[in-house]
Amino acid sequence: IITKGGNLVNVVPDEVVIETLVRAANKDAIADAAAKADRAFRSGAYAIGAQCQITTMPGYLPALSAEANEEVLAAAQIASQSSKKDYEVVKQDTTAHSGGSTDVGDVQHIQPVLTFNTGGKVSGLHSVDFDIVDDELAYVVTAKIFALSAYRLLKNGAEKAKEVVENYQPIFTKEAYIQYMDSFITSESTDL
């Protein structure tokens, strides 16, 4: 978005400030897209003989898709069957990529994170038409899934939770994650 683009109509602004985000399906694609975005800004400035200042900060890493955890899936099935309505439990397509991102993706690059999505809403999360249309599914079933998942993972001395941790292959160590994120903190200025 252009956050500053001049103060007067019909006058070429002396300063234009653009803020943008780069998102991608994996960390390598993020680095590639960020380099291309910076190159595009430099090229645009060069084309019109302008100075270009680029300040880069890291954003969220993408969420990592994984097969449904059997304990969470079982919890979802139990919770959906114990409700007033009959809700269908569907495994998420692990090949699909969402353009949205949160800090969950960052945590998943370091340690295992079990996530699930429930319904009970209409429209996109940040849209003007967003609304909760099924309180039972949005709140009650979701809370039951959380509680049952925790119980199933932690019973028998946390046997299933320990399996999740033991079988997880992290993308980064904590130190490597910090180094990767710090590598995006840059500032450059090009004068013509």
List where the protein language model places each region.
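Basic/polar N-terminal segments that are highly enriched at the extreme N-terminus
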Residues: 7, 191-192
